[in-house]
């Protein structure tokens, strides 16, 4: 059972990284869960909004604006999805 849980988490990480890579025109290998949007990836606020809209659509979660402003790293997105995806 633990393996399935880890696979699900890894899958979430991979999908989030793919969404960001596609949005930013980057290679998947350039992005990790520790990557910071602004500092490491050069993502501006408009692109962050676009990424979060894609994340909402991809995972079927709603990310309110007040929560979205707290998201600074890829790991923040992954953790939010894990906490709010049913």
Swiss-Prot record:
Subcellular location: Cytoplasm
GO CC field: cytoplasm
PTM note: 4'-phosphopantetheine is transferred from CoA to a specific serine of apo-ACP by AcpS. This modification is essential for activity because fatty acids are bound in thioester linkage to the sulfhydryl of the prosthetic group.
UniProt similarity note: Belongs to the acyl carrier protein (ACP) family.
Protein name: Acyl carrier protein
Organism field: Rickettsia bellii (strain RML369-C)
InterPro entries assigned to the protein according to its UniProt record, in alphabetical order: ACP, ACP-like_sf, PP-bd_ACP
A single MF term (Gene Ontology): acyl carrier activity
Stretches assigned to the Carrier domain: 7-85
Function text: Carrier of the growing fatty acid chain in fatty acid biosynthesis.
Top-level taxonomic group: Bacteria
Gene (UniProt): acpP
Pathway: Lipid metabolism; fatty acid biosynthesis
PROSITE patterns, per the entry: CARRIER
């Amino acid at each position: 059972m633990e393996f399935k849980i880890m696979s699900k988490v890894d899958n979430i990480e991979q999908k989030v990284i793919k969404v960001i890579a596609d949005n930013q025109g980057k290679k998947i290998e350039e992005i990790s869960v520790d990557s910071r949007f602004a500092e490491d990836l050069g993502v501006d606020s408009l692109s962050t909004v676009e990424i979060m809209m894609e994340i909402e659509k991809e995972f079927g979660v709603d990310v309110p604006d007040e929560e979205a402003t707290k998201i600074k790293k890829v790991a923040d997105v992954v953790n939010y999805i894990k906490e709010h995806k049913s």
